[in-house]
A protein has these predicted regions:
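Soluble FAD-dependent oxygen oxidases
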Residues: 1-461
């Protein structure tokens, strides 16, 4: 078969195809992580499934490497590729809510904010992350942790169905009864098996929540982390609360007298009656020293989801590392605090996201996501707007991770991997599910067409 020409491909596309000579090329190819700069040969800006199929067929016939962009929030820049084809689905943002069935169908270009906007008017939400600019596609396929995780599970646990374009250009549906093996692999296996063009989610009742951040001086961090560690297992699952080592942002609306201080924070969300949330948090706060400030209060759920957006715009320098954590002994807490004191910038941070509760009620082999017994998913992120500090934030992150990794469980969250997602790391992450994922890759993508990702290589690639 003769390979599709560029002219034919462009003619087959409803959306624009952006090339290097085009005026908007640099703007379109730019990535969320300003530390990463890639130069694709072409960018296919898909508007529908037919555009995605045309892009896959063109790339396959012309032996082009492809990268898949959904919401465009990928940390290691895996949504782009040098000298290949970026299949950009960021314009495919449709959201349809079925309030009777409590389900949501979302396009692959949607961000969490897009989904929250559509669901909130019905008093519903899909469990997702903590920043509204996060793309729902990569979040779901890699796992998805956030404020609702303890009560309702991972984002991927709430995926009911997906429409997928395979490497050969076929379109299939994956759910419990149709292509069930692919449905299994999509829930945690990343973008290894195809391009998801439609996600069907289970949504849950969420409207106004009792939520917000509480900050303490880092001198109190040991006590805060100890009491938080001891409190969490007995806390109701309606409480989603993560602990972080951060810096009070040097900007309004944060109190001027505390701006720039190294801090320990608990950012919490209680999805239930406000009085119940206040009572639950009081049981934790009464054990702790007085905070620098406590901004917990009633707010619409989307307001909580977007609270941190202004601090993390597109284009910052990012380097992150993560681990799963089962226990948090005092020695680990001390190691965390020692590293956090030397944070290279005001934006650099460490967060421990709880992944107990509902996550543990799913079997280890029920989805590709294998980690069902951990307590937290940890991320360490070196962040700064200045490109000259890229090396410094990277070194700090790696050093911090090396200091606390001995206290971690096996593997890490694939959405928190950068350049550390090699075969051994992925095998540790997927555990007993890894061989099954390789077999699935052999079936659905035997040539490793989809390889610009945290890659599970087929057996004979």
């Amino acid at each position: 078969m003769q390979a599709m020409s560029t002219e034919t491909f462009i003619g087959n596309m409803r959306g624009p195809v952006v090339r290097r000579m085009d005026a908007d090329y640099d703007a379109v190819r730019s990535l969320y992580n300003g530390m990463i700069d890639k130069s694709p040969m072409m960018i296919a800006r898909c508007t529908d499934v037919a555009d995605v199929v045309a892009s896959v067929n063109f790339a396959r016939q012309n032996d082009l490497q492809v990268a898949i962009r959904g919401g465009g929030h990928n940390g290691p820049g895996l949504g782009s590729v040098d000298n290949g084809l970026m299949i950009d689905m960021s314009m495919m943002k449709g959201v349809r809510v079925n309030p009777t069935a409590c389900t949501v169908r979302a396009g692959p270009g949607c961000t969490q904010g897009d989904v929250d906007h559509a669901t909130h008017i019905y008093g519903l939400a899909v469990p997702a992350g903590i920043v509204s600019t996060t793309g729902i596609a990569g979040l779901t396929l890699g796992g998805g942790t956030g404020y609702l995780t303890r009560k309702h599970g991972l984002t991927t646990d709430n995926l009911l169905e997906a429409d997928v374009v395979l490497a050969d250009g076929r379109i299939v549906t994956a759910n419990k009864s149709e292509n069930a093996d692919l449905y299994w692999g999509l829930r945690g296996g990343g973008g290894n098996f195809g391009i998801v063009t439609s996600f069907l989610f289970q949504a849950h009742p969420v409207n106004v929540v009792y939520a917000g951040p509480v900050f303490w001086d880092i001198e109190d961090a040991r006590t805060i982390m100890q009491k938080y560690r001891d409190f969490l297992p007995g806390a109701p699952e309606e409480l989603g609360a993560f602990v972080g080592l951060k810096t009070v942002p040097p900007m309004a609306p944060f109190p001027a007298e505390h701006q720039g201080k190294r801090a320990c924070a608990v950012i919490a969300c209680y999805n239930g009656p406000t009085g119940d949330g206040q009572a639950v948090m009081a049981k934790l706060l009464e054990k702790l020293p007085p905070p620098l400030f406590n901004w917990m209060g009633e707010m619409p759920y989307p307001a909580l989801q977007s609270m941190f957006d202004p601090f993390f715009p597109k284009g910052l320098q990012w380097y992150w590392r993560g681990d799963f954590v089962n226990e948090l002994p005092d020695e680990a807490i001390d190691a965390h605090i020692a590293q956090a004191r030397n944070a290279p910038s005001a934006l650099s941070l460490m967060h421990l996201y709880p992944i107990d509760g509902a996550v543990r009620r799913v079997g280890k082999s029920d989805t590709a996501w294998n980690t069902r017994n951990a307590t937290w998913s940890m991320v360490i992120a070196g962040i700064d707007p200045n490109p000259q500090k890229a090396g410094e934030v990277t070194r700090w992150t790696k050093g911090y991770w090396e200091a606390v990794h001995p206290y971690s469980a096996d593997g890490g969250y694939v959405n928190f991997m950068m350049d550390d997602g090699d075969d051994s790391r992925l095998k540790a992450t997927y555990g007993d599910n890894y061989d099954r994922l390789v077999a699935l890759k052999d079936k659905y993508d035997p040539t490793n067409f989809f390889r610009v990702n945290q890659n599970i290589r087929p057996l004979h690639s």
